[in-house]
């Protein structure tokens, strides 16, 4: 049976489904690490390496940390995810301290419809090199479920060229929506049930990482598997 492509309407509808957020696995300890392998992907094994390469190397995905870093970490996130917010600063601190981590951001807005607006704002900011500053501004919003207006105010407060951002939201709408759709498809291929989730080297970590020290420990474990 041929399945139609995932659309932005599908993502918005899923974000609005009652009870979906309750499926998120909130906190996983180091012992719950599982190696990313063919078994993690529902498609044929021959396609798995290509799919993982697209997750790691999607040219449109924002990248921070050390773009030439030898260890790649992918983070799936939602700007209305409370555990994503708690994870953001420890992750940033650990990445800065390490100096050799390439971070790939996967905006996966699944918790509320306003989460989609947050993702679109951050991705539009990437066209002027402002993804990371907008990312941290959105993560710093204290409201448990931030609305679109509150998100826009937080982005404006960063001092980013908001007129250009709005222009990019319109002119790059197709590219931005396509990236969010790809992120969603990739999350489904990994059988993720919610945010946050991480790929660190060869490990899939489906849940919150609570401290910079935990991130550092995971970096070390991932390097042992290279």
In which residue ranges do the predicted regions lie?
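N-terminal secretory signal peptides
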Residues: 1-23, 34-38
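N-terminal twin-arginine translocation
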Residues: 21-30, 36-52
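Short N-terminal segments immediately surrounding and downstream of signal-peptide cleavage
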Residues: 48-64
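Short active-site neighborhood of thiol/selenol oxidoreductases, capturing the structured segment around
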Residues: 67-80
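Loop/turn elements at helix/coil->beta-strand transitions in domains of secreted/extracellular proteins
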Residues: 72, 99-102, 129-132
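The canonical Cys-X-X-Cys-His
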Residues: 81-85, 198-199
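Typically the conserved alpha-helix immediately C-terminal to a functionally engaged Cys/Sec
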Residues: 85-97
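Cysteine-centric redox/oxidoreductase cores and disulfide-bonded domains
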Residues: 109-195, 199-225
């Amino acid at each position: 049976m041929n399945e139609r492509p995932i659309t932005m309407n599908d993502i918005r509808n899923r974000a609005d489904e009652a009870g979906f957020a309750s499926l998120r696995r909130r906190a996983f300890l180091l012992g719950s690490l599982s190696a990313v392998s063919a078994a993690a992907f529902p498609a044929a094994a021959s396609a798995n390496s290509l799919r993982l390469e697209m997750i790691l190397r999607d040219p449109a995905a924002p990248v921070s940390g050390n773009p030439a870093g030898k260890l790649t970490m992918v983070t799936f996130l939602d700007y209305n995810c409370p555990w994503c917010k708690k994870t953001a600063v420890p992750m940033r601190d650990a990445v800065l301290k390490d100096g050799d981590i390439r971070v790939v951001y996967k905006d996966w807005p699944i918790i509320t419809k306003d989460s989609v607006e947050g993702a679109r704002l951050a991705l539009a900011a990437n066209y002027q090199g402002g993804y990371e500053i907008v990312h941290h501004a959105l993560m710093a919003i204290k409201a448990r479920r931030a609305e679109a207006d509150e998100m826009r105010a937080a982005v404006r407060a960063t001092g980013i060229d908001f007129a250009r951002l709005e222009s990019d939201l319109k002119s790059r709408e197709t590219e931005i929506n396509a990236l969010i759709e790809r992120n969603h498809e990739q999350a489904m291929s990994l059988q993720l049930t919610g945010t946050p989730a991480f790929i660190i080297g060869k490990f899939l970590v489906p849940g919150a990482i609570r401290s910079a020290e935990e991130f550092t420990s995971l970096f070390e474990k991932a390097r042992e598997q290279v």
